[in-house]
Curated annotation (Swiss-Prot):
Keywords: Amphibian defense peptide, Antibiotic, Antimicrobial, Disulfide bond, Secreted. It comes from Odorrana hosii (Hose's rock frog). One of its GO terms (cellular component) is extracellular region. The lineage of its organism: Eukaryota, Metazoa, Chordata, Craniata, Vertebrata. Expressed by the skin glands. It is found in: Secreted. Belongs to the frog skin active peptide (FSAP) family. Brevinin subfamily. Has antibacterial activity against the Gram-positive bacterium S.aureus ATCC 25923 (MIC=28 uM) and the Gram-negative bacterium E.coli ATCC 25726 (MIC=14 uM). This is Nigrocin-2HSb. Disulfide bonds join C15-C21. One of its GO terms (biological process) is defense response to Gram-positive bacterium.
């Protein structure tokens, strides 16, 4: 759903910013 999509995007952004990808 929309909420899951937003949460998934947030996790990707946090991953990229933290460099833990």
């Amino acid at each position: 759903g929309l909420l899951g999509s937003i949460f998934g995007a947030g996790k990707k952004i946090a991953c990229a910013l933290s460099g833990l990808c």
